[in-house]
Amino acid sequence: MAKAKRMYGCTECGATFPKWAGQCADCGAWNTLVETVVEAAPSGSGRGGWAGQQANLKTLAEVSVEEMPRFTTGSTELDRVLGGGLVDGSVVLIGGDPGIGKSTILLQTLCNLASRVPALYVTGEESQQQVAMRARRLSLPEDKLKVMTETSIETIIATARQEQPRVMVIDSIQTIFTEQLQSAPGGVAQVRESAAMLVRYAKQSGTAIFLVGHVTKEGALAGPRVLEHMVDTVLYFEGESDGRLRLLRAVKNRFGAVNELGVFGMTDKGLKEVSNPSAIFLTRAQEAVPGSVVMATWEGSRPMLVEVQALVDTSHLANPRRVTLGLDQNRLAMLLAVLHRHGGIPTYDQDVFLNVVGGVKVLETASDLALMAAVMSSLRNRPLPHDLLVFGEVGLSGEVRPVPSGQERLKEAGKHGFKRAIVPLGNAPKEAPAGLQVIAVTRLEQALDALFE
């Protein structure tokens, strides 16, 4: 038997080194090297590529290109995040905080899929009785889905080859181990090798696999960063565990758009998809309040209306506070400087708090104009109309720049009964949606004047 060799692997990029160091020489990350045991694989161990032991060489012209077949999961929101459905042979990694609903949504999906295609649910964290209890509590169909409690990757793959499921769930990848390594499950080497064997099996058999991944206290997926590079799709489940809304976001997708967002609501019968998220994120209070404005953000392939709230108050600190929830804090500091320079509105003695209602994260620059409108409304203590929509990027010289998909954003506003919209001139349509007055601006000063007409 080959002698085991101790190496140090980086949890971020997967690089290995013979000695420990404070910084990874490959990716530059600090304090990411952990000790692993590397064993020489015996000859003929079957560690070949997806095409087998012999290389398969073709020119691009010789490769037949066909549209990747997809099949629906039964959930419109999940299909949207996946890019239109599940692709045969794809590997999807889904991560999120404990209790956010990762196992729930996958159990619901597989129970519904099992009535149409063979499905296998593999759990290393729960017993079969616990999975059955959860399915009955959610009133899910139980007669078709096969459940297996196992943590050995060799046993899991052998069972999958025998059952030949079209869809399989591994809950979770951190509990799975390979007998070829002596390290404990959840280690860098175990997670990497187990995931590699699952990816290889998925590509060879055409089975679509969902992997559940744990997250660290910083919110990143636990284990080696190479895990995210190996899979086809990476999804993150976001939201407060004690809240009602759950947001499923695609941060990597080889078969669809990234940053695609699916919205779900947690009920006593599990996760229910929200087909009209704009209606959920708009509070529509009885009376207009200062500091509140609605913007149209773009998530993946669809527009979504969200409410931005600002609170500006006199600061008693030497350095006024700048707090954001769902928005970029550095961009807020920049926009406040632009507001002072080109709008003549100083905030150096004011605390500024910003929040996006519903826990949505808005990272695109189309939120600039709405952010500044909310700050102005709170600072002057003057409410903005309920039926006003604002979006646009603001540059350092005070110009208002157009943003992508402006027409679709305006159509979404028109569907929800908005009457006025302040937008960049480049996004002004030739013919506005019925009932919507579009005010096109090119400068920040024009936008501020239009806000309080």
UniProtKB/Swiss-Prot annotation:
Q: Which InterPro entries match?
A: AAA+_ATPase, DNA_repair_RadA, P-loop_NTPase, RecA_ATP-bd, Ribosomal_Su5_D2-typ_SF, Ribsml_uS5_D2-typ_fold_subgr, Rubredoxin_2
The GO terms this record gives for MF are: ATP binding; ATP hydrolysis activity; ATP-dependent DNA damage sensor activity; damaged DNA binding; zinc ion binding
**What does the entry give for GO biological process?**
recombinational repair
Q: What Pfam families would the database entry show?
A: AAA_25, ChlI, Zn_ribbon_LapB
Alphabetical keyword list: ATP-binding, DNA damage, DNA repair, DNA-binding, Hydrolase, Metal-binding, Nucleotide-binding, Stress response, Zinc, Zinc-finger
Short sequence motif named RadA KNRFG motif, residue ranges: 252-256
* Ranges annotated as C4-type zinc finger: 10-27
Question: Might you give the EC number(s) for this enzyme?
Answer: 3.6.4.-
Q: What is known of its domains?
A: Has a putative N-terminal zinc-finger, a middle region with homology to RecA with ATPase motifs including the RadA KNRFG motif, while the C-terminus is homologous to Lon protease.
Q: Which NCBIfam families match?
A: sms
The protein depicted here goes by the name DNA repair protein RadA
- Lineage, uppermost ranks: Bacteria, Pseudomonadati, Pseudomonadota, Gammaproteobacteria, Pseudomonadales
